[in-house]
């Protein structure tokens, strides 16, 4: 909404500069690429004149953006409003306009060309995946990239393919943002310049990311550059002799246009928006809506100012922020060293501005409900044009203004005096032939066996796309809630895609993949929940199906559950196992490969600084703790299966607490302590099966575990867990000597009824973070001193706890005390932990030693508490403000790792990697906050990015250009590694913020060598 006032700040002859600026733009009156030109200025010399009227509207389907919304704020930065999305270029189709045509791509795999004057479809062409960035028109051709990993040139006249090239390696497809995609998707807008098409391929450096130059005439590769640890996302920008390559949510990079050589990072605001005009560059929008301006040369001064969008002519910048649109005199701004304060010519208040462009003598501003036309020289409003949904993108030429809306509509406005035209035709869905659509034999039974709601289905049924096949596809689409992939021959692909698109299914619920005769389907293993196949494809169906219980194959009409993966690890408790080992038994041998990415994003997740409960994983299910509930995700393809609300369930500062969630080993049941009730949830459907009240009046459930098929729990004061959020509280919990959460009783809930089989109260306190179980025994530290006995808060410091404490072993069957040993441990000032594995009990503690954390580890026999060995170490990182003093050990079959030290489990002697001459310690190669997890052959942790450390050779492998959570969220489970998103509220420059999963054991990703241009 535009408010009815305008502020004219400068009264000098500004319009002369505006006119000169338009003259410099030349007579260009088309919009052939995103934001109008190769510099992404969002300005064109000529636009439609006079009063505009609505001319036509076309429906493109509901957009499906790749990335979720950002977090709802940041405690650490004291930001109490939603963060700005920094990689949101596909919120709706972005149209381009040239030669009387409007062309756009959609997330429904379509490229469509419509007549600019009538909106009538001239042609449409389908890609193998979503088209997330605007096409580019040049020389009578339409150049487009897609998530199928291909760059194509289409004839503007009829949409026929002129050439098609895959710049990245030809690798099996994976699950990406809920779709079947190439592991090397085209996630930058193409730049066409001087007969060259510049493009990127790839999103995850682990799989390889590349910058390429292709000959616009025939698609021949001119040169190729490997980008390293870069995730190219956004529109490529022409910067004269250079290219700006956006890096997703991080800072953009500068590469030489002639050969792709890396020049430097642009020290600008983070995000995918980049604009060049002359020698100046602008970028943003940052996490809080901030644009940065600077000259392109190295070392130039950078100035930041509030803004989310801008349009730039040679003389004027139009800046749009969340409150207003401003016209800035660029020469005055340069004279002021980039400060916009003294360069404002006019400004107009805008509520909810979303897009801004310049077309001729007008500025067009899109908002939630209208497009407003203003005079470029004064800001006076000429006209307001109503629209049905928020404006995402605008484009214009001399005859029309085109607006793309958030609901998928594209609406055009033309001068009122233009010749009347017929409206665009409505998209008609062809009727299905009469008769009830029947699911193929066995599919209904397969769906019952899954009983898990949303998921992925695959049809491998025989060749030929006749009427019967169309009916089968319709039956599968209408008779299940699965997202289906149909494997067809190359000759059938376009027709099947067209059929599915006409029904509104392509993209949103269906994909088509080409299968070559006699070859495996080019798709990663174990990606589909239900596979429909014929007997000749049995082996292929089993390869592609998720392991049981989340996978079913229907072969020749018989539904069979896929076999479970016996090697898959499970993370059923806060620290992995009821024994608190922070480890699983699976292998990480082989090469990590991306299996899926997307899943849930940060918008519902708790602020990372609060260090919430670890996600859990078992039986093909991953459970994440959201701010307001729980989210169940498929571990093999990232599909969000279910989401339930758990009001006031979130606990914070989990290093000082015990786990309050537990997942059954097969993922079929979940138990969650929610205030005074213990909720039992069906893991397949997310439905709440039971709410068990606490058996002791006035108490809440504390620690919850499951060992030997029986639940174990603790009872605490309602105020004991940390549940309040505020900057001051988060800041406190990162300091040293913070209190531990404690319970007043241990108990085993009855299987029937709401009582307890046994209860072991204490006059002092049970320390939640030390409670663990194995082999029919329960272990914990019991504090018995005066301060523990007098406490009524449920929180005590380590010093207060260790005033008089003992390690206690209970019989899990009846709660009897089997043994106890006094615990005197002055070194454990900041944290206490207990873990049990293989008959060994591990006591962990830490203290602040100057600016470093000192770690202390003791190994006792679990049978009687006799001490076997003790070890200690010092964190090499001088930093006590990121939780270094609250780490926990990772207990493995042969080794135990405690942050910087790795020790032999039977002797406590330091472990060294092969070839080490002595003095080795484990130092993470990068930021070292958050805890560690592990398996017998490696450790997982944050080192800036999620990283694998291998015991076999002491090597480090970076998994993804993302930020893990601040406690535990890198899980070695399901045959690989799953990383549910837990970095919500991060404002730093990490390119990707999403959940993801990796498989191990396949061959490493092939790396394409750099190819330099021919001399």
What positions do the PLM features span?
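A short glycine-rich, Lys/Arg-flanked "PGG" loop and its adjoining helix->strand segment in the class I
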Residues: 538-550
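A short acidic, Gly/Pro-enriched loop at the edge of an enzyme's catalytic core
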Residues: 518-530
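Conserved SAM-binding strand-loop segment of SAM-dependent methyltransferases
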Residues: 505-518
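Conserved class I S-adenosyl-L-methionine
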Residues: 453-475, 481-485
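Conserved beta-strand signature within the Rossmann-like core of class I S-adenosyl-L-methionine
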Residues: 549-557
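Aromatic (tryptophan-biased) beta-strands that constitute blades/sheets of beta-rich domains
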Residues: 30-93, 100-103, 120-127, 158-180, ...
